[in-house]
Structure formats: C-alpha cells, structure tokens
C-alpha cells in the first residue's frame, strides 16, 4: 500500500511555483493546498498572483480566496484547518500537493505551531505604546538586541510580527526563537519537500517583469478598491502598501512601482534565508520538471 505523501513545493516569490505546481498536481491527479497567507483573501488577486480561474479549473485548490479582508486569521487556525482538509483528501488521493511562499504557514503544516505563551494585555499595551511613541525602527533595534536570530528573518516592515516577538521576549525573558524551534509534531503522512531556486539575477529580472505585468493587469485599480481598509494587517503587503503611498499623495506612481520591485526582491531574499535552514528541502531549478517528477516518483513510498 502506498503511504500518504504530502509534496511541499516552496521557493521565493516570482521563482515559478504556480505553473510547476499545476503540472505536478496534474501528473499525480491530485489537489493543491495553498500556503500563501495573502491568497486567502478574496479581494487580493492580482497583487498576490493568485491562481486564475483557468488554473483553478485545471486543478482543485484549497485556501484560495476563502476569507474577507476583515477576517482575523492566524497560522494556528491555518494548521488546524489544513490538517482537517488533508484528512479528507488522503481518503481520495495518496499524494497531495502544498505550495506557497509563506514561511510560517509552510512550517505550521510540516512542523506544527509551537506552544508560544499567551501575551498578557499589559505587555501588549506597553509595546503598542512604544510603537506609537518611538516608531517601528526603535522596536526593530530592540529586537536585534534581544533576539538577533529572529531579527535576521522577520519582515522588519511588519509591526505585528516585530511587536509579537518582543512581547514574548518581555514576558518570558527568553528569545522568541527559542519558542519557535521546539520539537516538531509527528504527522500521519510522509512529507517530501521540493525547493525551487534560480540564479539571483534571473530571479530579480522575473520579479521586476512580474510587477510590470501586475500593473498591466490592474494592480492599481485593485489596490484602490481596498484602499479604505489600508490599516488592516492583511494589507501590510508588498504591492499594496506601496500603491497606498501613491494614493496618499506621498509618492508618484513610477516611484511606487520601483519600490514594489525593490521590496519584492528583499522579501525573496528573506524567504531564501528561511528556507535554506531546512536540510530536508531538495533544491531544483523550475525548468527541471523531468528530474523533479523522477525524484518524487522514486521517493514516494
């Protein structure tokens, strides 16, 4: 009997995961689970490079466009819901594919969410006050002192992530990293991790061209349609936050587009830093489809 296997296809933004994920899913006649924390939102299609209606017809997808912008959602909820969906899918398929670039969501399924302490209201209020009065840069500098390892990989432009890490440091006297690296949970399926990578110059060129394509497809109009919700964490996202600066009158449009490209490149580097720590990932160029399928066939028990 073939063991249940979860293929995890990961890689930085713009590397070429989408088309290859479709081809792998079609080869194994299975479904795709998205691990992109922004593709969850129905209003965010162009800026998240969400699967198109045609792609959704080719392969059944889960966790794409299922939330509204105002819905609260966490990696812990994602873990619970994906594990439930996987239990159902493995009754129909011996292989399921999970793909995306949201590092915490991938880890939530492969390793499980760590038992991070609940933050008390006093600590949260203290740090929110510091954020309001001192700004994000000062909090980032403090995080660098208290937890230099997490500082290297966290999105320093995301106040929610920075503040949460500091909350744990304040409350426990330990690093946030120490709670994130505990023993991983056992899963009732085999996990095979495929990483996609490209030469940096090649990847950066693809990212730049993809941003231009998003603008041609209507990213400005999409960002304008959600502008009223711009304070939500779900919109503290590359591609939207830069256009909000344009809509606020702070930047001109050409500058905003260049900042989207720059911030996308920075994000891709952070993704690779995170993924490269994982020795279970087998790395390929996206055009090595034949080699990837051969490796998967040989590895599925």
Curated annotation (Swiss-Prot):
Record's catalysed reaction(s): adenosine(37) in tRNA + dimethylallyl diphosphate = N(6)-dimethylallyladenosine(37) in tRNA + diphosphate
Organism: Bacteroides fragilis (strain YCH46)
UniProt-recorded name of the protein: tRNA dimethylallyltransferase 1
Protein keywords: ATP-binding, Magnesium, Nucleotide-binding, Transferase, tRNA processing
Signal peptide: none
Named cofactor requirement(s): Mg(2+)
Coiled coil location: none
Site residues by UniProt (Interaction with substrate tRNA): 102, 124
Entry EC number(s): 2.5.1.75
Binding residues for substrate: 13-18
Assembly notes: Monomer.
Function text: Catalyzes the transfer of a dimethylallyl group onto the adenine at position 37 in tRNAs that read codons beginning with uridine, leading to the formation of N6-(dimethylallyl)adenosine (i(6)A).
An example Gene Ontology biological process: tRNA modification
Domain of life: Bacteria
Binding site for ATP: 11-18
């Amino acid at each position: 009997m073939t063991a249940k296997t979860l293929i995890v296809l990961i890689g930085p933004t713009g590397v070429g995961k989408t088309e290859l994920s479709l081809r792998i899913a079609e080869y194994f006649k299975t479904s795709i689970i998205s691990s992109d924390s922004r593709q969850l939102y129905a209003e965010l299609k162009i800026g998240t490079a969400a699967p198109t209606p045609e792609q959704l017809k080719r392969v059944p997808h889960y966790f794409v466009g299922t939330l509204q912008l105002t819905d609260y959602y966490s990696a812990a909820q994602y873990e619970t819901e994906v594990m439930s969906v996987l239990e159902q899918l493995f009754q129909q398929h011996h292989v399921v594919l999970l793909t995306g670039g949201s590092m915490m969501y991938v880890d939530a399924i492969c390793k499980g969410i760590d038992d991070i302490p609940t933050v008390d209201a006093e600590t949260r209020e203290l740090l929110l006050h510091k954020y309001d009065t001192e700004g994000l840069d000062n909090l980032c500098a403090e995080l660098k002192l208290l937890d230099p390892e997490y500082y290297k990989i966290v999105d320093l432009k995301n106040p929610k992530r920075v503040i949460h890490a500091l909350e744990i440091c304040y409350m426990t006297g330990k690093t946030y990293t120490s709670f994130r690296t505990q023993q991983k949970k056992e899963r009732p399926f085999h996990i095979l991790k495929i990483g996609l990578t490209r030469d940096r110059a090649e990847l950066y060129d693809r990212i730049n061209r993809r941003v231009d394509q998003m603008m041609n497809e209507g990213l400005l109009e999409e960002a304008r349609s959600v502008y009223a919700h711009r304070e939500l964490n779900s919109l503290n996202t590359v591609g939207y936050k830069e256009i909000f600066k344009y809509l606020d009158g702070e930047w001109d449009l050409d500058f905003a587009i260049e900042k989207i490209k720059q911030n996308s490149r920075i994000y891709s580097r952070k993704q690779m830093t995170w993924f490269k720590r994982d020795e279970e990932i087998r790395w390929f160029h996206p055009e090595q489809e034949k080699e990837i399928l051969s490796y998967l066939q040989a590895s599925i028990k």
